[in-house]
Protein backbone atom coordinates (compact mmCIF):
# COMPACT_ATOMS: atom_id res chain seq x y z
CA UNK A 1 0.00 0.00 0.00
CA UNK A 2 1.16 3.53 -0.77
CA UNK A 3 2.40 5.75 2.03
CA UNK A 4 0.02 8.41 3.33
CA UNK A 5 0.97 11.90 2.12
CA UNK A 6 0.99 14.51 4.90
CA UNK A 7 1.91 17.54 2.81
CA UNK A 8 3.69 19.16 -0.07
CA UNK A 9 6.37 21.84 0.30
CA UNK A 10 7.33 24.05 -2.64
CA UNK A 11 10.63 25.92 -2.44
CA UNK A 12 13.06 27.68 -4.77
CA UNK A 13 16.63 26.98 -3.68
CA UNK A 14 19.95 27.90 -5.36
CA UNK A 15 21.44 24.74 -6.90
CA UNK A 16 23.92 22.95 -4.65
CA UNK A 17 23.40 25.47 -1.82
CA UNK A 18 20.62 23.99 0.33
CA UNK A 19 21.39 24.57 4.02
CA UNK A 20 19.35 24.07 7.21
CA UNK A 21 19.09 27.88 7.52
CA UNK A 22 15.87 29.66 6.47
CA UNK A 23 13.96 29.20 4.20
CA UNK A 24 14.74 25.46 3.98
CA UNK A 25 15.03 24.56 7.68
CA UNK A 26 11.77 26.02 9.02
CA UNK A 27 9.72 24.78 6.04
CA UNK A 28 10.94 21.19 6.48
CA UNK A 29 11.13 21.29 10.28
CA UNK A 30 7.43 21.97 10.78
CA UNK A 31 6.68 18.76 8.86
CA UNK A 32 9.23 16.75 10.86
CA UNK A 33 11.50 15.98 7.90
CA UNK A 34 15.20 15.18 8.39
CA UNK A 35 16.60 18.51 7.17
CA UNK A 36 20.22 17.39 6.73
CA UNK A 37 19.21 14.35 4.68
CA UNK A 38 17.21 16.59 2.32
CA UNK A 39 20.00 19.19 2.02
CA UNK A 40 22.61 16.53 1.24
CA UNK A 41 20.47 14.77 -1.38
CA UNK A 42 19.34 18.06 -3.01
CA UNK A 43 22.92 19.37 -3.22
CA UNK A 44 24.09 16.10 -4.84
CA UNK A 45 21.29 16.16 -7.41
CA UNK A 46 21.74 19.82 -8.36
CA UNK A 47 25.55 20.15 -8.24
CA UNK A 48 25.74 20.35 -12.05
CA UNK A 49 23.36 23.37 -12.19
CA UNK A 50 25.45 25.66 -9.96
CA UNK A 51 24.39 29.31 -10.06
CA UNK A 52 20.76 28.64 -11.00
CA UNK A 53 17.69 28.75 -8.76
CA UNK A 54 15.97 25.34 -8.80
CA UNK A 55 12.29 24.95 -7.84
CA UNK A 56 11.66 21.78 -5.83
CA UNK A 57 8.43 20.08 -4.71
CA UNK A 58 8.92 17.97 -1.58
CA UNK A 59 6.32 15.32 -0.72
CA UNK A 60 6.19 14.53 3.01
CA UNK A 61 4.74 11.19 4.15
CA UNK A 62 3.12 10.15 7.45
CA UNK A 63 6.23 8.24 8.60
CA UNK A 64 8.26 11.49 8.22
CA UNK A 65 10.03 10.21 5.13
CA UNK A 66 10.08 12.38 2.01
CA UNK A 67 10.63 12.40 -1.71
CA UNK A 68 11.24 15.37 -3.94
CA UNK A 69 11.08 16.40 -7.58
CA UNK A 70 13.31 19.13 -8.99
CA UNK A 71 11.90 21.30 -11.77
CA UNK A 72 13.66 23.38 -14.42
CA UNK A 73 14.85 26.86 -13.35
CA UNK A 74 12.30 29.71 -13.71
CA UNK A 75 12.14 31.29 -17.18
CA UNK A 76 13.12 34.70 -15.78
CA UNK A 77 16.36 33.27 -14.33
CA UNK A 78 17.24 31.64 -17.67
CA UNK A 79 16.46 34.87 -19.57
CA UNK A 80 18.62 36.93 -17.20
CA UNK A 81 21.47 34.45 -17.66
CA UNK A 82 21.12 34.50 -21.47
CA UNK A 83 21.16 38.34 -21.53
CA UNK A 84 23.88 38.56 -18.85
CA UNK A 85 21.87 41.02 -16.72
CA UNK A 86 21.37 41.15 -12.94
CA UNK A 87 17.66 42.00 -12.96
CA UNK A 88 14.83 42.94 -15.27
CA UNK A 89 13.50 46.45 -15.85
CA UNK A 90 11.47 48.18 -13.15
CA UNK A 91 9.40 49.78 -15.94
CA UNK A 92 9.33 47.19 -18.74
CA UNK A 93 7.10 49.21 -21.11
CA UNK A 94 9.33 52.29 -21.04
CA UNK A 95 12.81 51.03 -20.13
CA UNK A 96 14.34 48.20 -22.14
CA UNK A 97 17.34 46.60 -20.43
CA UNK A 98 18.54 44.00 -22.96
CA UNK A 99 17.86 42.09 -26.18
CA UNK A 100 17.43 38.36 -26.71
CA UNK A 101 17.43 36.47 -30.02
CA UNK A 102 14.80 33.99 -31.22
CA UNK A 103 17.44 31.21 -31.06
CA UNK A 104 18.06 31.88 -27.36
CA UNK A 105 14.29 31.93 -26.73
CA UNK A 106 14.07 28.55 -28.54
CA UNK A 107 16.86 27.08 -26.36
CA UNK A 108 15.15 28.26 -23.17
CA UNK A 109 11.77 26.93 -24.39
CA UNK A 110 13.32 23.51 -25.17
CA UNK A 111 14.88 23.41 -21.70
CA UNK A 112 11.61 24.42 -19.98
CA UNK A 113 9.35 22.18 -22.11
CA UNK A 114 8.86 19.40 -19.49
CA UNK A 115 7.49 21.92 -16.96
CA UNK A 116 5.39 24.08 -19.30
CA UNK A 117 1.78 23.29 -20.17
CA UNK A 118 2.42 24.06 -23.84
CA UNK A 119 1.41 21.65 -26.59
CA UNK A 120 4.12 22.69 -29.06
CA UNK A 121 7.55 24.29 -29.05
CA UNK A 122 6.10 27.41 -30.72
CA UNK A 123 3.60 27.84 -27.87
CA UNK A 124 6.41 27.43 -25.34
CA UNK A 125 8.50 29.99 -27.23
CA UNK A 126 5.67 32.53 -27.08
CA UNK A 127 5.38 31.98 -23.30
CA UNK A 128 9.12 32.57 -22.85
CA UNK A 129 8.98 35.63 -25.16
CA UNK A 130 6.11 37.04 -23.06
CA UNK A 131 8.13 36.56 -19.88
CA UNK A 132 11.07 38.34 -21.53
CA UNK A 133 8.87 41.27 -22.60
CA UNK A 134 7.47 41.61 -19.07
CA UNK A 135 11.07 41.93 -17.82
CA UNK A 136 11.91 44.74 -20.27
CA UNK A 137 13.89 42.47 -22.61
CA UNK A 138 13.33 42.97 -26.35
CA UNK A 139 12.86 39.76 -28.39
CA UNK A 140 14.54 40.11 -31.79
CA UNK A 141 13.46 38.16 -34.87
Swiss-Prot record:
Xref: InterPro entries: Ribosomal_uL11 (IPR000911), Ribosomal_uL11_bac-typ (IPR006519), Ribosomal_uL11_C (IPR020783), Ribosomal_uL11_C_sf (IPR036769), Ribosomal_uL11_N (IPR020784), Ribosomal_uL11_N_sf (IPR036796)
Keyword match Lipid biosynthesis: no
GO annotation, biological process: translation
Coiled-coil region: none
Record GO cellular component, one term: cytosolic large ribosomal subunit
UniProt keyword annotation of DNA-binding present: no
Transmembrane segments annotated in the record for this chain: none
Gene Ontology terms for molecular function: large ribosomal subunit rRNA binding; structural constituent of ribosome
Modification note: One or more lysine residues are methylated.
One Pfam family it belongs to: Ribosomal_L11_N
UniProt keywords, alphabetically: Methylation, Ribonucleoprotein, Ribosomal protein, RNA-binding, rRNA-binding
Its biological purpose: Forms part of the ribosomal stalk which helps the ribosome interact with GTP-bound translation factors.
NCBIfam families: L11_bact
Subunit structure: Part of the ribosomal stalk of the 50S ribosomal subunit. Interacts with L10 and the large rRNA to form the base of the stalk. L10 forms an elongated spine to which L12 dimers bind in a sequential fashion forming a multimeric L10(L12)X complex.
The family this protein is said to belong to: Belongs to the universal ribosomal protein uL11 family.
HAMAP family in UniProt: Ribosomal_uL11
Name this protein carries in UniProt: Large ribosomal subunit protein uL11
Species name: Acetivibrio thermocellus (strain ATCC 27405 / DSM 1237 / JCM 9322 / NBRC 103400 / NCIMB 10682 / NRRL B-4536 / VPI 7372)
Amino acid sequence: MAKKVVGYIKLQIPAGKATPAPPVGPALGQHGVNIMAFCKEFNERTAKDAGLVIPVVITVYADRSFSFVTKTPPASVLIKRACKIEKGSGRPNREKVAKISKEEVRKIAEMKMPDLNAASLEAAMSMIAGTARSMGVVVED
